[in-house]
From Swiss-Prot:
The lineage of its organism: Bacteria, Bacillati, Bacillota, Bacilli, Lactobacillales. It catalyses: 2 reduced [2Fe-2S]-[ferredoxin] + NADP(+) + H(+) = 2 oxidized [2Fe-2S]-[ferredoxin] + NADPH. It comes from Streptococcus pyogenes serotype M3 (strain ATCC BAA-595 / MGAS315). It comes from the Bacteria. This is Ferredoxin--NADP reductase. It is an enzyme of class 1 (oxidoreductase).
Length: 330
C-alpha cells in the first residue's frame, strides 16, 4: 500500500525538528517526523536529560528532559495532523512527481517538501570496549543518566574525565552511597571550576587508571577491574551501577548520499534555509551559513522561516500570509 504524501516531512526529532513540526501544525499542514532514535528529543533528551540548559528564551533554566517534555506537549495540540516514525534512518530521497520519495531502513515515505533537522547526525556512545560490556548495558551499565534518583543509596563508579563525568559525579555525591571516578589521566578535561569542586568533594578519584575487565552475574555488573597506567597495579571496584562517560560519536554518513551542497559536515543553505535542491530545507546544526551560531535558540528561530518557505513551495497560489499564533489558537 502506497504511503500518503505528507505536506512536510521533517528529518530529525530533536528540539528543532519538534518545534518545526509544531509550527507546521500551526500553519495547518500535515507533518511527518522521521527520527533514527527510539525516542524524541535528540541530544538534550538522550545525552543530558537532567543537566540544566540556560539559553532557552523565557526559561531561566530547565533540564534537557523538561525541554523535551514541553516540546512534545506543545506538538500534541496537532497530533491529528502529525505522524511520528521512530527508529528509522533516512538513507536517500529522490524527486518524484508531486514531491519526494524518502527511503529509510524500514519503509518508503512520500512528501511534498522536506526539512532536514538532524543536527550533527546519528550518535552512539563510546564504550569501554570490554568483553561482556554489551551484556550489562542498560541493566546497571549506563552511557547517560536519565534520572539521578535511580542511583540513590548505590555504589556508583563513573569512567571518564570530561564535563559530563565530573558533572554526574558532583550531582550524585549526595544521592549515592558512594561515587568513584576512574580516569586514565591525572588531569581532567572538564571546566576548571568543576574540577576544583570535584577535588574538594567526597567523590573518590582514581587516576591514572584504565578499565580492564567487567565481572558480574547475568545482566548485572558487580565489579570493574582497573589497572594503573604503565604499572602492574590492579584494583577491583565493587559497584551497584557503572556510568561510562566517554562521550558520543556522531555520524552524518548518509548525508553525503543526499546530493546536496555541503560545508564540512553540514548542509549549505540560503538565507531562507533552502538547500541546493528546491523543496528541501535545512535548519539547526544541520544547516551551514555565514555567521551561524550553533544554539538551540537559533534553530528555534530558523524553523518558522523554513516551514513558511516550504509551504510557499508546496502551495504557491495559496494566500500564505503569516499570522500570529494568537489569531490562530483560541
Amino acid at each position: 500500500m502506497k504511503d500518503k504524501a505528507y505536506d512536510i516531512t521533517i528529518i530529525g526529532g530533536g528540539p528543532i525538528g519538534l518545534f518545526a513540526a509544531f509550527y507546521a501544525g500551526l500553519r495547518g499542514v500535515t507533518v511527518k517526523i522521521i527520527e533514527s532514535l527510539s525516542e524524541l528529543g535528540g541530544q538534550p533528551a538522550i545525552l543530558y536529560p537532567e543537566k540544566m540548559i540556560y539559553d532557552i528564551p523565557a526559561y531561566p533554566s530547565l533540564t534537557g528532559a523538561e525541554l523535551t517534555e514541553n516540546l512534545i506537549k506543545q506538538l500534541s495540540r496537532f497530533e491529528d495532523r502529525t505522524t511520528i516514525c521512530l527508529k528509522e534512518e533516512v538513507l536517500t530521497f529522490d524527486k518524484v512527481k508531486g514531491g519526494f520519495s524518502i527511503r529509510t531502513n524500514k519503509a518508503e515515505h512520500f512528501s511534498k517538501a522536506i526539512i532536514i533537522a538532524c543536527g550533527n547526525g546519528a550518535f552512539a556512545p563510546r564504550t569501554l570496549g570490554l568483553e561482556s560490556e554489551e551484556n550489562f548495558a542498560d541493566h546497571n551499565l549506563f552511557y547517560n543518566v536519565h534520572q539521578l534518583d535511580q542511583f540513590a543509596g548505590q555504589k556508583v563508579v563513573i569512567c571518564g574525565g570530561g564535563d559530563s563525568a565530573v558533572d554526574w559525579a558532583l550531582a550524585l555525591e549526595d544521592i549515592a552511597e558512594s561515587v568513584t571516578v576512574v580516569h586514565r589521566r591525572d588531569a581532567f578535561r572538564a571546566h576548571e571550576h568543576s574540577v576544583e569542586l570535584l577535588k574538594a568533594s567526597t567523590v573518590n578519584l582514581l587516576t591514572p587508571y584504565v578499565p580492564k575487565a567487567l565481572k558480574g552475574i547475568g545482566n548485572l555488573a558487580e565489579k570493574l577491574v582497573i589497572q594503573k597506567v604503565k604499572e602492574d597495579e590492579v584494583l577491583e571496584l565493587e559497584l551497584d551501577s557503572l556510568i561510562v562517560s566517554f562521550g558520543f560519536s556522531t555520524s552524518n554518513k548518509n548525508l553525503k548520499n543526499w546530493n546536496l551542497d555541503y560545508k564540512r559536515s553540514s548542509i549549505t543553505v540560503s538565507p531562507l534555509f533552502q538547500t541546493s535542491q528546491e523543496g528541501i530545507f535545512a535548519i539547526g546544526d544541520a544547516a551551514a551559513y555565514n555567521g551561524k551560531v550553533d544554539l538551540i535558540a537559533t534553530g528555534f528561530g530558523e524553523a518558522p522561516t523554513a516551514v513558511n518557505q516550504a509551504i510557499n513551495y508546496i502551495y504557491p497560489d495559496r494566500d500564505n500570509r503569516v499570522v500570529h499564533s494568537t489569531s490562530l489558537i483560541d
